[in-house]
């Protein structure tokens, strides 16, 4: 606070007394203010090979963890990390490719179905995103009868921008993010899967109400388009609407709410530039007619990845927050939400210096993270309490 002082002696004394009074009020307020909660981190597992995704099994069966090099493992409290589960598909593990997401069927208690996304090599040596499912055996040692039901067409990647995130909506629809394989204009071509979010039934069929289901040559699986490399996908538990995030180039990481049939701009609309610092050649600005604006974006890219909405009861200070991992800036980002608006941003765990790949809310109300390193970790994160 700045006080405008008169230069007479009497007024100087008045303002000095007023300053002392205000200072005492500020000190008293700070003395009774609630302390900032301390974030507590527990390392549950290390030695993981670039872990990418995790999924909680019910009834304390453990946590499934994918490693990008092609292994699916089972972590259980108090037990050694499992050997790789059998029945997992072969993967293209070059560059950003490999075994990517693991997700459970909404009816896992009945069907024990496990979904996996991965980079799959084609006949010409290039790769694309693929998704399939199999049945986790009762022993948790194998995925049986794995069947691929979605393949990105055509396969164009030489190791970049696969997407690969999976999430179910409340109606059971399966959303899949598909990167543009670092070939920008494919994201605007509806005859290609590149740079899209697709929606399928749990059995891999095209829902009749998909926006391009009867609009050949558009791919009927497409839900939304104009995406670069979507690395986060989560259902908003309060609105029941799917949210996604994606990497920009140099700047322009985004959070979006993908709506059926809408164009999210890449590469025509972007808040980023090329890694060289030069403009994106196809870009027409940050706001382009016919494209949707992000809910939130960063001018300097954190390298956002997995994300999760905090809807648990354990830590009230985190209610109505969206947590996102940051690969480049090596932090956990907390966004405070008011409806669909971001009203505050907080950075956590930056002192650890670890690339945070996946973020999940556990059934116990703690946040679980995977760090994308050759010695990757499974972390459990919470707030210190007086309880």
Could you tell me what each predicted segment is?
Residues 1-15:
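N-terminal secretory signal peptides that target proteins for export/translocation
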Residues 16-29:
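Bacterial N-terminal signal peptides
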Residues 33-184, 232-235, 240-248, 300-338, ...:
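Acidic, Gly/Ser/Thr-rich repeat motifs that build Ca2+-stabilized beta-propeller blades
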Residues 34-40, 79-83, 136-147, 205-219, ...:
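Beta-strand initiation motifs
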Residues 85-95, 146-159, 202-223, 267-298:
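Surface-exposed loop and turn segments in beta-propeller and other repeat-based domains
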Residues 120, 176-194, 252-254, 258:
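Short, conserved, GDST-rich strand-edge loop motifs in beta-rich repeat architectures
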Residues 130-138, 190-202, 258:
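Beta-propeller blade signature
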Residues 343-363:
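Conserved blade-ending motifs and adjacent loop-strand segments that build the rim/top face
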């Amino acid at each position: 606070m700045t006080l405008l002082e008169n230069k007479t002696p009497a007024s100087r004394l008045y303002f000095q007394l007023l300053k002392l009074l205000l200072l005492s009020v500020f000190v008293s307020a700070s003395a009774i203010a609630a302390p900032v909660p301390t974030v507590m981190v527990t390392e549950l597992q290390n030695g993981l090979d670039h872990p990418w995704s995790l999924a909680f099994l019910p009834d304390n069966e453990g946590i499934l963890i994918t490693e990008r090099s092609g292994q699916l493992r089972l972590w259980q409290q108090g037990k050694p990390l499992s050997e790789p589960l059998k029945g997992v598909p072969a993967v293209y593990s070059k560059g950003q490719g490999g075994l990517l997401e693991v997700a459970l069927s909404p009816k896992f208690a009945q069907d024990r179905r496990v979904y996996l996304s991965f980079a799959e090599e084609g006949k010409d040596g290039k790769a694309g995103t693929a998704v399939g499912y199999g049945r986790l055996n009762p022993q948790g040692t194998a995925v049986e009868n794995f069947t691929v039901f979605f393949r990105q067409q055509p396969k164009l990647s030489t190791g970049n921008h696969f997407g690969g995130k999976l999430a179910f909506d409340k109606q059971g629809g399966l959303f899949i993010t598909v990167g543009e394989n670092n070939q920008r204009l494919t994201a605007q071509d509806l005859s290609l899967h590149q740079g899209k979010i697709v929606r399928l039934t749990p059995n891999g069929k095209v829902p009749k109400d998909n926006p391009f289901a009867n609009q050949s040559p558009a791919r009927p699986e497409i839900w939304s388009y104009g995406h670069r490399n979507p690395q986060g996908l989560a259902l908003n538990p309060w609105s029941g609407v799917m949210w996604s995030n994606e990497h920009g180039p140099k700047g322009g990481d985004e959070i979006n709410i993908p709506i059926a049939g809408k164009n999210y701009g890449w590469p025509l609309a972007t808040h980023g530039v090329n890694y060289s610092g030069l403009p994106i050649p196809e870009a027409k600005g940050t706001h382009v007619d016919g494209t949707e604006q992000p809910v939130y974006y960063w001018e300097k890219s954190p390298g956002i990845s997995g994300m999760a909405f905090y809807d648990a009861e354990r830590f009230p200070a985190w209610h109505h927050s969206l947590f996102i991992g940051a690969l480049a800036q090596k932090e956990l980002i907390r966004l405070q939400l008011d409806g669909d608006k971001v009203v505050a941003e907080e950075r956590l765990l930056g002192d650890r210096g670890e690339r945070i790949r996946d973020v999940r809310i556990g059934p116990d109300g703690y946040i679980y993270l995977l760090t994308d390193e050759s010695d990757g970790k499974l972390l459990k994160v919470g707030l210190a309490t007086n309880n």
